[in-house]
């Protein structure tokens, strides 16, 4: 993941969205004026993020998961107010988000996407994703879908599941065919934490495996980055 974080603007987009989710989590677990301010700030950042990258509209899924885990939906009001303020600003300046999305979809599907069959990239996207997040993270994700984890609805597992759902939706949209190791970075960066679900004794091994994997990919595969 570090390969693409270091050289891609998507890492900046990921940072904006990540701070938005963080502030939303703080709002959901805080109280009083701090909670209100944090929720509005979260909405401002998450609202701004969808103008950086159309795909970041899918951050609504993990955002809802954050509120569900905290069992506090009141910050949603402040977040919506903040997000609408961003939308109003861009719309007032003459940019309508849905027109931009429609044009992007048309240009993408009539351009480079024509030479990238969905039948292949629907699964190859995830192969690229595994290269980005590393085998330890990909292996650990199955624990988030375990019976005990689903029954207990533990926070960490719920967030991991939310981001997996995001990636499935992004894949089915057919607007991400190839380059998902970069395009999906704002979502995939969260999955790098998945090895925390593995036994503690394996953590050092996972860290080493991630470092070796990154070096091998950057040395043996032409990533163009």
Label the model's feature ranges:
Residues 17-38:
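Membrane-interface transmembrane helices that cradle and orient dolichyl/undecaprenyl
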Residues 4-13, 180:
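Short acidic/glycine- and proline-prone juxtamembrane loop motifs at membrane-interface regions
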Residues 31-32, 72-77, 141-162, 201:
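Membrane-interface helix-loop-helix junctions at transmembrane boundaries of multi-pass membrane enzymes
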Residues 2-4, 36-54, 60-65, 82-86:
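Membrane-interface alpha helices of multi-pass inner-membrane proteins
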Residues 15-23, 57-70, 189:
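Hydrophobic transmembrane alpha-helices of multi-pass, membrane-embedded glycosylation machinery
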Residues 82-84, 200-224:
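Signature aromatic-anchored transmembrane alpha helix within multi-pass, membrane-resident enzymes
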Residues 130-154, 166-171, 193-194:
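Hydrophobic, aromatic-rich transmembrane alpha-helices
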């Amino acid at each position: 993941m570090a390969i693409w974080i270091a050289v891609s603007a998507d890492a900046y987009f990921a940072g904006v969205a990540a701070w938005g989710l963080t502030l939303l989590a703080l709002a959901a677990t805080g109280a009083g004026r701090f909670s209100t301010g944090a929720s509005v700030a979260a909405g401002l950042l998450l609202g701004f993020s969808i103008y950086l990258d159309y795909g970041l509209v899918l951050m609504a899924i993990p955002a809802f998961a954050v509120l569900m885990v905290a069992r506090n939906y009141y910050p949603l009001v402040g977040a919506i107010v903040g997000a609408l303020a961003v939308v109003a600003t861009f719309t007032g300046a003459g940019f309508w988000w849905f027109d931009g999305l429609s044009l992007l979809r048309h240009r993408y599907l009539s351009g480079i996407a024509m030479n990238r069959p969905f039948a292949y990239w629907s699964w190859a996207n995830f192969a690229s994703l595994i290269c980005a997040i590393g085998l330890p993270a990909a292996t650990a994700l199955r624990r988030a879908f375990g019976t005990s984890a689903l029954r207990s609805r533990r926070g960490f597992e719920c967030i991991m599941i939310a981001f997996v759902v995001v990636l499935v939706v992004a894949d089915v949209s057919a607007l991400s065919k190839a380059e998902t190791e970069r395009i999906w970075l704002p979502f995939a960066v969260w999955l790098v934490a998945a090895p925390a679900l593995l036994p503690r004794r394996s953590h050092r091994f996972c860290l080493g495996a991630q470092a070796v994997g990154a070096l091998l990919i950057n040395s043996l595969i032409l990533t163009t980055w």
